[in-house]
């Protein structure tokens, strides 16, 4: 499913179906949504306007400057979130193609685009299936936390490599594997509840979606990028900002970076 959507002023908001019934019994109250940050960020985050935010409570693209000038560039966004990143990029003159497997997130992004009155091409699709994007047609690829919910990351990387121009940049953020070791609801200092080398996934669900977060070590990510012909040129273990904490803030963020940001460049053809 895809559409080319130009926002227009409207008092209407798009409706969305739930993916499934999450109640445990007909007469039971709905269970509380649960899961790691990647279950709700950036989709439920109150993000700064006009700039790409890579994670909660860390500096934005305005400080990191990983993307460069996006004006007149064709940008692929993997994972729509709330549509804030696509809107920010389109507002800076980029021609944005945004992809997400979730119909709900597509509808939320459409509403954000509508309010901002910008133009974004939306596709509902698996992140590893991009038949609607021609080879060597993308100038820049971006993803914020969405790859945490991907099972076969190499497959996604191969697709991104296919559609990027040679030497073009791919910037993405993920949960930092060190932060995943800590109890976010624990004390100060937080307790270690998971091995750094634990490859197990962490299931999550919200009112509209569900999935499994997969934590990957930095070496695993670097190896996956190398074998799909990407060259890593920046790794950022994001330190928290000194501003007022967001609803995503936990004490554990003072002890380990919650967000890992990687910039890689396409090599070869």
Where do the model's predicted regions map?
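A short SAM/SAH-binding and catalytic strip from SAM-dependent methyltransferases
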Residues: 139-154
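Class I SAM-dependent methyltransferase SAM/SAH-binding core
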Residues: 74-129
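A short glycine-rich, Lys/Arg-flanked "PGG" loop and its adjoining helix->strand segment in the class I
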Residues: 154-169
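Short alpha-helix
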Residues: 211-235
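A short acidic, Gly/Pro-enriched loop at the edge of an enzyme's catalytic core
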Residues: 128, 132-140
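Acceptor-substrate binding/catalytic loop of class I
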Residues: 174, 178, 205-220
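Conserved class I S-adenosyl-L-methionine
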Residues: 2-71, 84-88, 105-108, 112-115, 169-203
């Amino acid at each position: 499913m895809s559409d080319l959507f130009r926002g227009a002023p409207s008092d209407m908001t798009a409706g969305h179906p739930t993916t499934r019934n999450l109640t445990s019994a007909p007469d039971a109250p709905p269970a509380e949504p649960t899961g790691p940050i990647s279950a709700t960020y950036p989709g439920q985050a109150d993000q700064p306007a006009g700039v790409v935010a890579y994670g909660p409570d860390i500096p934005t693209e305005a400080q990191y400057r990983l993307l460069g000038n996006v004006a007149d560039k064709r940008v692929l966004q993997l994972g729509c979130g709330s549509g804030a990143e696509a809107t920010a990029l389109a507002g800076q003159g980029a021609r944005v193609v945004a992809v997400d497997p979730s119909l709900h997130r597509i509808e939320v992004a459409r509403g954000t685009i509508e309010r901002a009155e910008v133009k974004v091409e939306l596709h509902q699709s698996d992140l590893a299936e991009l038949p609607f994007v021609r080879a060597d047609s993308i100038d820049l690829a971006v993803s914020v936390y969405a790859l945490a919910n991907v099972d076969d990351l190499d497959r996604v990387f191969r697709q991104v490599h296919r559609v990027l121009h040679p030497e073009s940049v791919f910037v993405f953020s993920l949960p930092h594997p060190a932060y995943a070791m800590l109890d976010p609801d624990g004390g100060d200092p937080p307790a270690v509840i998971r091995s750094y080398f634990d490859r197990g996934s962490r299931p999550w669900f919200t009112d509209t979606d569900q999935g499994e977060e997969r934590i990957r070590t930095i070496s695993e990510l670097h190896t996956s990028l190398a074998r799909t012909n990407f060259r890593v040129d920046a790794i950022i273990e994001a330190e928290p900002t000194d501003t007022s904490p967001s609803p995503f803030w936990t004490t554990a963020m003072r002890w380990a970076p919650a967000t890992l940001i990687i910039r890689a460049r396409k090599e070869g053809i």
